[in-house]
């Protein structure tokens, strides 16, 4: 019979299928249970959403909540636009859609140039030498089948008269693993390929709110008889 056992090869420990010692003679071995089974599926999925946007300016602080929005819209009064600070809170959800537990060892956020990062409000994130944001807080947290782990990331945009429009932010699973070293069935971590389910984009559209002025005039009609 075959059992699963941890085997170390060149200081690399993995699980392998191991049999008892099989002695080969001049006779054939029959009824050997090799225990071959089809590999379980490993599949981690990542989705990125906008969960909250906070606007700070001379008029005060306003907070707008969003429910799993991947296209969030925000309007700022034209008189308050320049100098407004916009804090965008993203929710990154990693879900195990496969058949065996696994790990999201590293998450990467490809921060766009119009957003700024602060380590003071993002304790689990850091800027790497590649210029991107990285998070390894889930390295040792097993994600069971059907389970979802959630990360948050808050980025800041300082508004001017000329930088309204769409901000696109993408996150991806940079490294993933499982005890059987089975690769993800439909994604390659960290390869920046759109369309794979370990990568997701959230967009924020910031526009100007303009007031409408109504003028009521008086029409005088003179009738000459």
Would you name each region that the model predicts?
Residues 7-10, 14-24, 29-71, 161, ...:
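Extracellular/luminal low-complexity Ser/Thr/Pro-rich, glycosylation-prone repeat/linker regions
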Residues 72-103:
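Short beta-strand elements of extracellular/lumenal beta-sandwich folds
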